[in-house]
Structure formats: structure tokens, C-alpha cells
Amino acid sequence: MTIKSDKWIKKMSQEHNMIEPFEAGQVKVINNQKIVSYGTSSYGYDVRCADEFKIFTNINSSIVDPKNFNDKNFVDFKGDVCIIPPNSFALARTVEKFKIPRDTLVVCLGKSTYARCGIIVNVTPLEPEWEGYVTLEFSNTTPLPAKIYANEGVAQMLFFQSDEECETSYADKGGKYQGQVGVTLPKC
């Protein structure tokens, strides 16, 4: 597997709608205001998060069970800035919709701007032929509230292309998160 360059990312996005909406360059300023950058980088694509969030709360004193997740553990929030409580987390989704080629695997890493503030981004790999908006998880590892800015860069996607197509893609196996639109909670 080889990591793909900005040239490949641009071609696949402009000719095959791999990323929509797509930004061919790096956006660092909007309306004369500095932002956390997003768009195409040398060997990746910096995604933005939308303004829809689910903030974790334990007001119900429940146990977190991935097989039987209680959606009442989240508070829905819509806005330009999400405040994550200390030692807690929030879910969001990307502004961008992805359509991953059959011979490609995508790995997500956090941006240094957030990592240096104790905010960790966690996303599982985007498998071959997966399509949809990516659900993002932000962990606030600090003892203080932390801000996440909507419509600004939050994570970088790295694209790895195999020398052969997989036998069974995410679409072939009917993956449970195929075509997700909003912030998607655990499914089992």
C-alpha cells in the first residue's frame, strides 16, 4: 500500500466525487479571520466538522455499553462552537461526504492544533467502498472545558491505495454504517 499525494486526491475528488464538497487548496483564513486550516495537503485531506454535535453526559448514571448504547447519554447541540466538558467527549460529523474507491483505505489522524490542547480525534478507518459522512469523536483529556470549532479543520485523512482490489469491500458486506448522514451512534 502506498500513501497517495495531493495530485491523486484532487483527481479522485474532481473526477470521481471522492470528497464533496472538495477544497483543492488549504483554507487558513475566512473573512480576514484565522481558522484551523482545512482542504488538500501534501499527502492528505484536512476535514471540517459540521455544526451538529452530540455531547456526552452521565446525568443518568448509566454504564456505557457498545452493544446496548443509551442515546440519552448525549445532549444534542447545534452551533459554531461546541464546548466539551472536562474529561468527556463529543461526537460530530464531517462537512465532507466521502466515497472511498474499492482499492483504497483511509486512516484519520488528529490535527496538531487540537492535539496540543489535549483534544484527541478518534475515527476508525474508512474501508474500501464505504460512503457517507464521517462520524468524528473528540475526547477532551483535560480537566478544563474545551472548544471545537464547526466548519474549520479538525482532522486529516490519509489515503492508502493497495496494489490490488480487495475481495470483499464494505459495500459488499453491507456494512452497518454505509451511507450514514448525520452523527451516527453505535450500532450492534
Swiss-Prot record:
Coiled coil: none annotated. Keywords: Hydrolase, Nucleotide metabolism, Nucleotide-binding. The active site is at E137 (proton donor/acceptor). One of its GO terms (biological process) is nucleobase-containing small molecule interconversion. Its EC number is 3.5.4.13. It is an enzyme of class 3 (hydrolase). GO terms for molecular function: dCTP deaminase activity; nucleotide binding. DCTP binds at K111, S112, T113, Y114, A115, R116, T135, L136, E137, Q156, Y170, Q180. It catalyses: dCTP + H2O + H(+) = dUTP + NH4(+). It comes from the Bacteria. Pathway: Pyrimidine metabolism; dUMP biosynthesis; dUMP from dCTP (dUTP route): step 1/2. NCBIfam families: dCTP_deam. Catalyzes the deamination of dCTP to dUTP. Homotrimer. Belongs to the dCTP deaminase family. This is dCTP deaminase. It comes from Francisella tularensis subsp. holarctica (strain LVS). The lineage of its organism: Bacteria, Pseudomonadati, Pseudomonadota, Gammaproteobacteria, Thiotrichales. The gene is dcd.
